[in-house]
């Protein structure tokens, strides 16, 4: 059996794709499956904050130790990394990114490769487990979280196995989606994601994950017990009412409800006139804002793994900015359940040579 989280989870997933004859089952959690989509890039945008901090805190330090540098040169390379890590936001301002100073001493040779392949091409395809999911022939249990950096990769792997896996793989495939962040397997606050405590029903960490792993592998490797094999293939935590639910597919059976952006042309900040409703707009003015790349909107909570806390965080300071357009529904008359992927169709133009548009769904 193969088991692991994060980097070790990569090994488990890639091992499943390699399909060695002795492999009988896999349990992978909080890990990437497609190293382009949702890991190095998100919808074509380089994951700058995450990649900077991940590379210098984990990868580059190990690489430097293997370069055979003289003591003085090694100390200088490590000092450069430490200085960069002390100021993630300041380091992120360096242009061009491909010439990031801390990585010019051999500490991260892959950095230039990543930035040289901004689109999904053969460079990424050759290590994409999702694209090769049809090669997986063993039972797979994989687990991620709403606030995990790797959420998208797990959802993509689930879809790929259900679409392209053979019947036995589909029947034996199980997916768990909890309310944690990426550090759930060693978190000192195992029921929390950011500022929200979801209660004892979501406790995770070694004391919870180890029994689950033993149960899974006892069944598939030793023929003991009933494994983690409920009839439903998906177990997910429904935030808001804070309960675990089960479904036969992901996303669960649902209806798509489109919401539309409205304003009188002044949707800037939470004090603006932006409104979100299910009524299509007619003739309305455009909303605009001034984008300053040297004063970007800060990452606040969410699926992050950088120098800010992931999970549920207060968005007030973000929504008070004039370069953020805010559209809010009227007070809800009854609870609304939102489960599954959320997408935005945006019509926009910009005078900037290069810019990105992002959208965030926030519980008010």
Segment roles from a protein language model:
Residues 2-4, 29:
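Short beta-strand immediately N-terminal to the catalytic nucleophile in serine-hydrolase-like folds
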Residues 12, 22-28, 33, 126, ...:
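Catalytic cores of eukaryotic secretory-pathway lumenal/extracellular enzymes that build
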Residues 136, 142-144:
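Short beta-strand/loop motif that positions the catalytic acidic residue
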Residues 146-151:
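Acidic catalytic loop of the alpha/beta-hydrolase fold
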Residues 152-173:
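Active-site-adjacent alpha-helix of alpha/beta-hydrolase-fold enzymes
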